[in-house]
Amino acid sequence: MKFLKRGVALALLAAFALTTQPAQAYEKDKTYKITILHTNDHHGHFWRSEYGEYGLAAQKTLVDSIRKEVAQEGGSVLLLSGGDINTGGPESDLQDAEPDFRGMNLIGYDAMAVGNHEFDNPLTVLRQQEKWAKFPFLSANIYQKSTGERLFKPWAIFTRQDIKIAVIGLTTDDTAKIGNPEYFTDIEFRKPAEEAKVVIQELNMNEKPDVIIATTHMGHYDNGDHGSNAPGDVEMARSLPAGSLAMIVGGHSQDPVCMASENKKQVNYVPGTPCAPRSEE
């Protein structure tokens, strides 16, 4: 599918072998098949381009096909977005991305991380987009300065095959310096890794999920070499206690992260071909 050339990563979490926590709804020593589909950096491309690329109609065709295939194998699907729905196509920008969010509803997105480009518009526009969307906008590290309260839900809970899955949202703290400063007078972007530690602790104490994953808009930088950018997914994964997160599905840097072998990234990846995700021990 040509629209896969921009921002679509399919991360398959084929099975959870959950055997460590007692008194849960799942059966001990049973393998559960849960497929996690993830897209990021959509940037207003709800419409198919003149080159046959992009378009939410094509994306729905693909997602529906995968859902059917997974269901036939007895599995379940969770569909996440790494954010940056906004900014890129005038047909979207001039409508405040309403077609994009309504299209994502039809595809069946479960949750979305808030991206930096969501703040290319005033907060009032973002709140309207939340009303259009039938899925939660997640970010644990964006706060309102005047109240000290988070602006968005930090997490969402989903149940797939009796498995309780917590999804945390996180946003790059670079947003404040790369966005329009007039929109941030009462908004604070805290360090995502530090907020992740707090949220994971809160989840384990209060919600007791079987699995915790993060959908982020922070960027992936090889070996954590983020340069002048704020730290991304790799640095956060290394800063957290082992086993804190089962998976990170991210966006922002828009680089495919496909592994040829352990600790060896695949070079010259061709969109649409198989992509083995990275494992950070």
Regions flagged by a language model, labelled:
Residues 74-76, 109, 208-209:
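Short, high-confidence coil segments that cap the C-terminus of an alpha-helix
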Residues 26-47, 78, 86-190, 228-280:
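Active-site-adjacent helix-turn-beta-strand microarchitecture at beta-sheet edges
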Residues 51-65, 105, 188-196:
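Short catalytic helix/loop segments, enriched in acidic residues and glycine
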Residues 58-62, 99, 125, 195-199, ...:
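Well-ordered alpha-helical segments embedded in enzymatic catalytic cores
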Residues 193-239, 243, 258-261:
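Domain-core and long-helix interface of multi-subunit machines
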Residues 39, 82, 215:
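Generic enzyme active-site microenvironment
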Residues 2-22:
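Gram-negative bacterial Sec-dependent N-terminal signal peptides
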